[in-house]
Curated annotation (Swiss-Prot):
Segments forming a coiled coil: none
Gene Ontology process terms (BP): apoptotic process; apoptotic signaling pathway; cellular response to hypoxia; cellular response to ionizing radiation; determination of adult lifespan; DNA damage response; execution phase of apoptosis; fibroblast apoptotic process
Name of the protein described by the UniProt record: Bcl-2-binding component 3
Gene from which this protein is expressed: Bbc3
Cellular compartments annotated: Mitochondrion
Organism taxonomic ancestry: Eukaryota, Metazoa, Chordata, Craniata, Vertebrata
Organism (species): Rattus norvegicus
């Protein structure tokens, strides 16, 4: 590798040798743009899923520090308590909000009670969908477990059949054990080891 560095060519990675520096994992691959709402991070396209299909807990969290978010009246963390009720504030003018904060402050049409205050509750339709998904996943897991158990039993029985001698071999061994073999008169009954 040192010679390749001197020659200016890129060294080929060799298994078993440590690299000079660890390569950072591209975290962008873990968070595709479809997961982000598109308003919180500039440069990302808007998500293909409509906000009405997502419960409030799946919306993007505010990117501002918690103290700034608390000063704006937002949640300290996603899905947390709200200190003030929703609606226009009668005591003064509304503060101007960035598009991301407007997105976080806007109620989801299918679940207005989910954002109204108090602990976050998913919309009834979303809860039913999640329960259906959980049931389907549980049924799939049970079917997979049953298939694996059946496959294990089949393999175990095949192994037993494979190791079990055939009936012809059993009869041959029986007859050969019962029949006296012809021996020389001076040969011992049993051969020494």
């Amino acid at each position: 590798m040192a010679r390749a560095r001197q020659e200016g060519s890129s060294p080929e990675p060799v298994e078993g040798l440590a690299r000079d520096s660890p390569r950072p994992f591209p975290l962008g691959r873990l968070m595709p743009s479809a997961v982000s709402c598109g308003l919180c991070e500039p440069g990302l396209p808007a998500a293909p899923a409509a906000p009405a299909l997502l419960p409030a807990a799946y919306l993007c969290a505010p990117t501002a520090p918690p103290a700034v978010t608390a000063a704006l009246g937002g949640p300290r963390w996603p899905g947390g308590h709200r200190s003030r009720p929703r609606g226009p504030r009668p005591d003064g003018p509304q503060p101007s909000l960035s598009p991301a904060q407007q997105h976080l402050e806007s109620p989801v049409p299918s679940a207005p009670e989910a954002l109204a205050g108090g602990p976050t509750q998913a919309a009834p339709g979303v809860r039913v969908e999640e329960e259906e998904w959980a049931r389907e996943i549980g049924a799939q897991l049970r079917r997979m477990a049953d298939d694996l158990n059946a496959q294990y039993e089949r393999r175990r029985q095949e192994e037993q059949h494979r190791h079990r001698p055939s009936p012809w071999r059993v009869m041959y061994n029986l007859f050969m054990g019962l029949l006296p073999l012809p021996r020389d008169p001076g040969a011992p009954e049993m051969e020494p080891n």
